[in-house]
Every structure is written in C-alpha cells, then in structure tokens.
C-alpha cells in the first residue's frame, strides 16, 4: 500500500507551549526546576504531535523534527559540530550550552542567524574553520526514537543532510572551501545512522534542500561519493528536496544509492515527469503534493488526478507527503473561533494537512468512494473559492487592468523632485530622523489588551494611543531630530496592522508560526482581492503633525513586504496580488498627502527575501516587485518626499533594482558591518538620498556620540554630504526609552558636529 507521511510538524505547540516554556526557562536563569519543566513540555509536545499524525492515519511518525531552538543547531549538536569558540564538550552538551550557542553568553556572542532559504524561518549559521571536527554528539534523537516507540509509533527519523549542513555554514579562519570538511562530516553521519538502525529505525529522511539552488559543479559531484559512504550500515534513506524544481539534478538524484527521493510538487509540479521517467525500480518516490508553506485547503480531486498515473507506474513505491515540513504552517484550524465558517472551509493548517495526505493515500489505495466525504468537502470548498464574490472584486480587477507605465513613474525625475523638496522642507545638511517605531511600553501593551478584551472602549483606547504619540513627539523634539515620526504605538505588527484594515485580508487568532527560537509570528491571510475602504494612518499622522512644525513622516508597509510576510492566495499570480496591495497603498499615500503629510515612508524590508532561489527567475520577480513599489509611491507631487527602509545583510546584487524603486530617500541597516555594506556603492552610484544606519538597535548597548560620528564620517567617504541622512539601523520598537533617549541624543550630537565641517559643501 502507498505510504503517507509528512516531512515534519510544527514544534511550537497549538497554544505556543514551547515558546512560553522557553521564556520561563530563560527568565528563571536555567534553574534545575525550570529545565525539568522545559523538558517535560518538549516531551508532551512531541507525544501530542505524533498522536496527531497517527490519528490522521499516517503510516509513520516523523521523529527528529523537534528542536529546542533550531533544527540546524540541533543537527550540529548531533554530529558534534557546534562552533569551537564556545569550547563545549560535544557529548556532554547541556541545554544551557545549546542555548548559549543560540543566544550568546558572557564570553561569546550568539551564532549568526539568517533566513532558511526563501522562507520566513531563521536558522543559526554553522561556523566552519580548518580546525572544525565532527563526531558523536547529544543523545536527543535517540531519546526521541525511544519515546516514539514506547508510545507504539513507527518512527521515521529526519535529519538535515550533510551537504546542506555544510552549504548553510560560513567559512572562517582561512578555510578555503567548506567541502573540504565533507570527509570529516560523513563519518559522523554514518555513525549516527548506524545507531538509528540499531535502535530499530527503518527509514531516515535526509533533507537536502540545496538541490533546489543553482548548485556549483563541485557540490553536485560530491553528492554521490558522500551517499555511497553513508548507505552501508544505515537504515533506508529518503533524500528529501523541496522549495523548488530540482529536475536539472534528476539524473544525479536518481543515481544516488539511497532507497528513495522526495520532490516538492507544489513549488515544482513540472519536475514530476523528469523523475517518473526511468525511475529506478529499487527506489520509492515521495511526492509532496500538500502545501507545507501555505494555509489553503488542498483540491483533493486535482491532486488525485495528478497522482493517479504515477501510482499506476510506481504502485506502492509512490509515497504521498507534504511538500516540505509543516514547520511553516500554523498548527490547528480548530483553534480559530473568530474566523467565519466560509473562510475556514477554504483553509487547512498543519493538523488538517496531515489528514489530507492520508486521504490521498486512501483514495489511491481504495478508490475515491472510500474517502468521499473528505473529497466532496474539498471539492465544494474549491468551487466556492473560484466563484465567491468575497474573493473576487470586479472593481479591483478593473483598476489593476487599467494600470499603465505612467502610474509607476513620478511626475519628475529625482533632481527636480529634490529641488522642490529642499525648497519645501529647508532641512539642514545631514538631516536626522528615525525609522518609524518607538518602544512598545507595558502601558501600550496593557491598553491594547484591554481594548481587545472589551475592558477599554474605543474612545478610551484612542486617547491612550494619542497620549503615546504626544510623548513620542515631545521626546523627538527634545533630542533635536529634524524629521519626526508618530511612533506607531497603535500598531501591534507592521503587517498585521494594515491587514486588519484592508479588505481581502483576514487575521487569525492563533495562526502562529515559528520565526526562530521562542519568537513566533502570526501572518495575515490574503484570501481575496485587496481593497482599501478608508484611510488607515491619516488620523494618526495628522494628529502627530498637529503637535509640531517639523515634518512628520507618514509610515506604511510596502506591497512586497505585505506579500512576503503573509499567507498569500494561491489562485492568482503573486505579482497580481502585489499590484492590488500597491493600489491600496497608493490611495493611502494620496490621502496622507492631501492631509498635509509631506514625507511618506513605504518600508520594504522583505524585498530581497522574495528573491527566487534560482537566478533564472529573479529578473521577473524584481520587475514586478519594483513596479508594485512604484505604483504605491508614485502618485504624489514632486515636493512630497518618499522614503523607504530596508534591512539586509547584503544587497549589492540587487542595487540596480533598489535604485529603480526611485524613492527619494532610502535608509539601510549598516552599523554591524561598520559601514562595509556601503562598499557596494563604490561600484554603483546610487542616485538618490540615503541614510545608512549609525546606531545598532538590535543591541541594548547605547553608542556614544564619538562612535556615531566615526560612522557618519565613514559614510561620507562613499555618499556625498548633500545626499546623506543620519538615522538608526531600524525601528526602535524593541528597545527601552532609557536606551532610546541616550542613543538618539548622541546621534543628533554627532550629526551636528559633522554638519559643521560639511555645511559649506552642501548647496543651499
């Protein structure tokens, strides 16, 4: 019979139990009692998740997908590969040691963190040097196998593969090539796999998502020898690829001496034919046809039609699965009491997706009639989504269709706009500002909670937030900032806030997914055509502007970031949805301008995150992403100044696209790199104004004026004074007011010092 399985289950718990247990553990100083409570929580979550898989009818439960903080870090712990600078004993690694690597300690900073491929999950970046060694590590995976077997489950273990583990790391201390470490890493994996076989594990899923990338030849060539060394003495190995089409590697993957392969049919449906053709008789093929990265209910009839001919060819060698781990999906739709029945009928969270996988397996094995109820309900939902007036708004579709190239262009080029803006605002050289948000204080959180619970009425909430705006304006005036912001006290999240106010978005109560460690995010759902029924931010910006004669920036989240940080409808191209959001934001910019707001910031921190994994797909993405931003921001007059903000660890490869946004001012995150990120501007002359961050807001440390002055002077080596702004790296939402007060006062002081030396060079 065809096997049904998933690649992984969310680890945080249906009520974010892991998040709260972790935070209690850290808050209690990693005491013995706190550690016992954390370990008990982890054990209970694993048991619940395995039972969910069993109740759904899956043929095995996935073990090894659980991690206390991050699965890449946990894999390093399994193979004794944590950074040497921490000095940990790999075999005696404690939870406190593990978290020290993730979060830093008194002696060492935390490991670097970055995005897991093109998802919104963050992994901890391995550190490799010529001295790196691997070997036996923690016993956690074997403990989990024993737990699963004791509960009567059939475990399939899951591990990040050796090639991916090396690829994801960074070379340090003169290591020329991470592949040099593969001969050291393979024996550690081989020993781990041999022990899993001894523990009674029949199958091990080895995740190698790097095959979805434009993989260099040396890495491709290393795959077969590595797996030839791994297979002897190991359980059956299922090499799992996901996140994109891997058909260019089909011959290589089919030639690997493993027992099976997994392919992602959601991100690469066309690749199926390349794998089924001449598929080896000794391998299973796991087809990931239930979307592990989105929230929409599977069209089971459509999936069955896609799988049926494959089943005829492969028989029981066809496995049914999710496209990738369900780590990226919310846990359970049953915990969404506020979503209406119509919308809920279109959705499937992780628990529901396990059932979809099993239903497809049963339909192939027993016929559709055996699971008619599940299939009929899915068919009704699919039909409703295709025709619902709630999803399809003819007015929005007409507006998108009517867009022209002129709508994506400002009336004048930057030089003319800059002259008009200088005349309007009369700012000094090196103008100072912030990125947007100020501290979300306990008072703000209490007022928001009281309002949501009905304890505080709407008028009381507005008054409480207005008081916070007044505080923010008064503080900025006391610092001496040149351009102010209202502080965003009323916003719980830079995407959810706008999603609550636009038609076509829905907000969940409990649709949390893990971002990293204990941090969870609750992405909005973009279920239909996006429309703005009324202004969203004009009241707040206008009130703030009424408190000062200095310019106050209106603050918006850009269309691409709204898209990237949401669960997006899958029934039309993402580019179309981006344009719909852009049109809504365009209306908001015009409303802000009409209300007298002369500077409007449209943030796009996720522009680079949306880059496709393969280079061949990137130009198309950047074309529509840039167009969406320009649609949002180009309707205003020449003397209205458009700002944008981006936080990247690197952006040199997309600088032409950033310039093509044609924002009057861009602010970027540069402090941690000591302005090295500005090196890209030595070969590409950015034409408009720029504010490289001079204050690292991610650290509680407060810089002094001398330190900030040094950074401003470094920036002036690359950016002309007449186009340079002075600002922090990012928003100040997570900082405390005492830190903000000291840092911004120092920033203004430093800017004034440097201003005296450049004033003569800046045109009036």
UniProtKB/Swiss-Prot annotation:
Catalysed reactions listed for this entry: 5-methyltetrahydropteroyltri-L-glutamate + L-homocysteine = tetrahydropteroyltri-L-glutamate + L-methionine
InterPro entries: Cbl-indep_Met_Synth_N (IPR013215), Cobalamin-indep_Met_synthase (IPR006276), Met_Synth_C/arc (IPR002629), UROD/MetE-like_sf (IPR038071)
Active site: 698
Keyword field: Amino-acid biosynthesis, Metal-binding, Methionine biosynthesis, Methyltransferase, Repeat, Transferase, Zinc
Stored CDD domains: CIMS_C_terminal_like (cd03311), CIMS_N_terminal_like (cd03312)
Paired cysteines (S-S): none
Binding site for Zn(2+): 645, 647, 669, 730
Biological process, per Gene Ontology: methionine biosynthetic process; methylation
Cofactor(s) in the UniProt record: Zn(2+)
GO MF terms held by the record: 5-methyltetrahydropteroyltriglutamate-homocysteine S-methyltransferase activity; zinc ion binding
Pathway(s) served: Amino-acid biosynthesis; L-methionine biosynthesis via de novo pathway; L-methionine from L-homocysteine (MetE route): step 1/1
Binding residue positions for 5-methyltetrahydropteroyltri-L-glutamate: 16-19, 115, 519-520, 565, 609
Residues annotated as binding L-homocysteine: 435-437, 488, 603
Enzyme Commission number: 2.1.1.14
Enzyme class: transferase
Textual note on the cofactor: Binds 1 zinc ion per subunit.
Amino-acid positions noted as binding L-methionine in the UniProt annotation, renumbered to this chain: 435-437, 488, 603
Highest taxon above the source species: Bacteria
Function: Catalyzes the transfer of a methyl group from 5-methyltetrahydrofolate to homocysteine resulting in methionine formation.
The family this protein is said to belong to: Belongs to the vitamin-B12 independent methionine synthase family.
Protein name from the UniProt record: 5-methyltetrahydropteroyltriglutamate--homocysteine methyltransferase
């Amino acid at each position: 019979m065809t096997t049904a399985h998933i690649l992984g289950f969310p680890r945080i718990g249906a009520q974010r139990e892991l998040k709260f247990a972790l935070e209690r553990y850290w808050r209690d100083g990693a005491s013995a009692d706190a550690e016992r409570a954390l370990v008990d929580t982890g054990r209970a979550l694993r048991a619940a998740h395995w039972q969910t898989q069993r109740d759904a009818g899956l043929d095995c439960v996935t073990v090894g997908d659980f991690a206390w903080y991050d699965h890449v870090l946990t894999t390093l712990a399994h193979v004794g590969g944590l950074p040497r600078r921490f000095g940990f004993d790999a075999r005696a690694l404690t939870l406190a040691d593990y978290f020290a690597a993730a979060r830093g300690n008194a002696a060492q900073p935390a490991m670097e963190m970055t995005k897991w491929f093109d998802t919104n999950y963050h992994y901890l970046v391995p550190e490799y040097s010529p001295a790196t060694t691997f070997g036996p590590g923690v016993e956690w995976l074997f403990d989990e196998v024993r737990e699963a077997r004791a509960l009567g489950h059939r475990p399939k273990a899951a591990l990040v593969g050796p090639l991916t583990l090396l690829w994801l790391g960074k070379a340090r201390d003169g290591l020329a090539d991470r592949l040099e470490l593969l001969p050291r890493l393979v024996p550690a994996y081989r020993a781990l796999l041999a022990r899993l076989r001894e523990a009674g594990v029949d199958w091990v899923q080895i995740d190698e998502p790097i095959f979805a990338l434009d993989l260099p030849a040396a890495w491709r060539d290393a795959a077969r020898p590595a797996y030839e060394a791994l297979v002897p003495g190991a359980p059956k190995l299922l090499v799992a690829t996901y996140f994109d089409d891997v058909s260019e590697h089909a011959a290589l993957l089919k030639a690997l001496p493993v027992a099976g392969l997994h392919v992602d049919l959601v991100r690469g449906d066309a690749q199926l034919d390349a794998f089924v053709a001449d598929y080896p008789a000794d391998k299973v093929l796991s087809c990931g046809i239930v979307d592990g990265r989105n929230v929409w209910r599977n069209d089971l009839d459509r999936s069955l039609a896609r799988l049926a001919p494959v089943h005829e060819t492969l028989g029981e060698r066809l496995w049914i699965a999710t496209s990738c781990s369900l780590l990226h999906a919310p846990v359970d739709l049953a915990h969404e009491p506020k979503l209406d029945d119509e919308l809920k009928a279109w959705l499937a969270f992780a628990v529901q997706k396990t059932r979809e996988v099993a239903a497809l397996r049963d339909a192939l094995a027993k016929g559709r009639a055996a699971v008619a109820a599940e299939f009929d309900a899915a068919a009704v939902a699919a039909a409703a989504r295709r025709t619902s007036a709630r999803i399809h708004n003819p007015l929005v579709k007409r507006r998108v269709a009517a867009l022209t190239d002129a709508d994506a262009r400002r009336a004048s080029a930057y030089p003319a706009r800059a002259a008009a803006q200088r005349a309007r605002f009369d700012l000094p050289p090196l103008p100072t500002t912030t990125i947007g948000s100020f501290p979300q204080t306990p008072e703000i959180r209490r007022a928001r909670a009281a309002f949501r619970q009905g304890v505080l009425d709407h008028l009381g909430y507005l008054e409480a937030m207005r008081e916070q705006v007044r505080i923010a304006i008064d503080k900025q005036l006391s610092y001496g900032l040149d351009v102010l912001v209202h502080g965003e006290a009323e916003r719980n999240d830079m995407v959810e806030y706008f999603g609550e106010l636009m038609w076509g978005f829905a907000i969940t109560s409990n649709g949390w997914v893990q971002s990293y460690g204990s941090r969870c995010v609750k992405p909005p759902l973009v279920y239909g055509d996006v429309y703005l029924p009324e202004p969203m931010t004009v009241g707040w910006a206008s009130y703030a502007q009424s408190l000062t004669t200095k310019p106050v920036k209106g603050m918006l989240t850009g269309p691409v970031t709204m898209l990237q940080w949401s669960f997006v409808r899958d029934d039309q191209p993402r580019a179309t949805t981006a344009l719909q959001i852009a049109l809504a934001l365009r209306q908001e910019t015009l409303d802000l301008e009409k209300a007298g707001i002369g500077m409007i910031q449209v943030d796009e921190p996720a522009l680079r995150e949306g880059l496709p994994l393969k280079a061949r797909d990137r130009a198309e993405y950047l074309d529509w992403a840039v167009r969406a931003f320009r649609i949002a921001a180009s309707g205003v007059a020449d003397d209205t100044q458009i700002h944008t903000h981006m936080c990247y660890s690197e952006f040199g490869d997309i600088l032409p696209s950033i310039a093509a946004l044609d924002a009057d001012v861009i602010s970027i995150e540069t402090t941690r790199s000591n302005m090295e990120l500005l090196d890209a501007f030595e070969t590409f002359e950015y034409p408009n104004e720029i504010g490289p961050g001079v204050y690292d807001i991610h650290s509680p440390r407060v810089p002094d004026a001398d330190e900030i002055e040094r950074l401003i002077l470094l920036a002036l080596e690359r950016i002309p004074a007449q186009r340079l702004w002075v600002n922090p790296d990012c928003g100040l939402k997570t900082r405390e007011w005492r830190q903000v007060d000291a840092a911004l006062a120092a920033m203004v002081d430093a800017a004034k010092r440097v201003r005296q030396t450049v004033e003569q060079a800046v045109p009036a």
